[in-house]
């Protein structure tokens, strides 16, 4: 599967805050990963499936759904109905970035 397009609109580790905008098409899938910080995902268009390590079932999310992922929660997003647009917020990101 191809990864989605990700744009960091505010890259601020010095401020411990980051916002990403994700544009995904049919067939896109995120890497299976966890983070050292909490993550908030807002679905603004499309339908996604979310697999996460803190739940047994795979959940489906669509327009205007908001998802909270605590730090260290391994997760993977799969596009189910494109186009998908996501706003991803890292309110306390403290690690160094490129």
Where are the predicted features?
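N-terminal non-globular leader segments, chiefly Sec-dependent signal peptides
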Residues: 1-14
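Structural signal for conserved beta-strand scaffold positions within catalytic alpha/beta enzyme cores
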Residues: 8, 21-23, 88
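Conserved short histidine dyad/triad with adjacent acidic residue
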Residues: 18-35
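Short, conserved beta-strand element in jelly-roll/cupin
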Residues: 35-50
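A generic structural motif
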Residues: 51-53, 78
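Short acidic-glycine-tyrosine-enriched beta hairpin
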Residues: 55-71
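Ligand-binding loop in jelly-roll beta-barrel domains
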Residues: 71-96
């Amino acid at each position: 599967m191809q990864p989605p397009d990700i744009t960091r609109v505010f890259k601020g580790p010095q401020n411990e805050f980051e916002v990403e905008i994700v544009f995904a098409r049919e067939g896109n899938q995120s890497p299976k990963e966890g983070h050292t910080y909490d993550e908030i995902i807002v679905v603004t268009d499309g339908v996604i499936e979310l697999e996460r390590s803190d739940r047994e079932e795979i959940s489906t999310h669509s327009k205007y759904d908001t998802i909270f992922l605590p730090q260290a929660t391994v997760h993977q997003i799969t596009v189910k109905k494109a186009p998908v647009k996501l706003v991803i917020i890292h309110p306390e990101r403290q690690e160094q970035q490129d």
